């Protein structure tokens, strides 16, 4: 029942076989870049404006980011961060908090204490910035719009702190659809909202030649 649909060509500046960072940059900004780079040009000095920034700042929309993989992985990161390398996980996490976006849900953060484990914890910083950090399904189920900005980390994490493959998911374990449904519930408002939803583990399964899990 959507009023419009769109498509994008996602080859990047140098490759017809690009990675998630450059392809997600194409989707979130409309611009090409090198593989491994998120929302910056080929010189890695000029930053691109994202669609999420535009709808938040110009239209007053609420914004939600949902994925089955880590919240600071390349695809979700391309809708709130700008980094020269997709491997800057801690920096990406900081930019997630700084975005002020309203709803994040998915797998756990990669390197939440920094690459060397000596930085202030990302989840603690998020709470200091006014986010409600949720790590149980029961608490996620109780979340309402009145709770304000929220970050939901899946309770039942699997490989690399991502959500389980749907193939392996327990009957009482939330699916991607459940996190989307909760997102719609808390983001819904008269002005409107933007939601980026990624089934990221489909990609992981294909990399592993695991047809069953796709």
Give each language-model segment a name.
Residues 85, 89, 172-180, 213:
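Phosphate/oxyanion-binding active-site loops and adjacent basic polyanion-contact surfaces
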Residues 66, 106, 154, 196-198:
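A cross-family glycoside hydrolase active-site/sugar-binding cleft signature
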């Amino acid at each position: 029942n959507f009023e419009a649909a769109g498509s994008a060509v996602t080859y990047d500046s140098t490759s017809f076989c690009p990675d998630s960072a450059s392809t997600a940059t194409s989707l979130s900004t409309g611009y090409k870049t090198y593989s491994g780079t998120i929302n910056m040009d080929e010189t890695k000095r000029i930053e691109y404006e994202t669609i999420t920034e535009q709808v938040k700042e110009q239209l007053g929309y609420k914004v939600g980011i949902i994925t089955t993989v880590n919240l600071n992985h390349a695809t979700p990161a391309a809708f709130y961060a700008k980094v020269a390398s997709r491997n800057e996980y801690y920096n990406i996490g900081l930019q997630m908090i700084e975005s002020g976006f309203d709803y994040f849900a998915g797998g756990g953060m990669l390197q939440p204490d920094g690459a060397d484990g000596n930085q202030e914890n990302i989840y603690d910083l998020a709470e200091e910035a006014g986010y409600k950090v949720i790590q149980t399904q029961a608490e996620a189920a109780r979340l309402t719009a009145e709770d304000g900005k929220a970050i939901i980390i899946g309770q039942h994490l699997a490989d690399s702190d991502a959500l389980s493959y749907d193939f392996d998911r327990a009957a009482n374990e939330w699916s991607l659809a459940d996190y989307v449904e909760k997102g719609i519930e808390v983001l819904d408002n008269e002005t409107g909202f933007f939601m980026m939803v990624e089934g990221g583990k489909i990609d992981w399964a294909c990399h592993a030649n695991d047809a069953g899990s796709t």
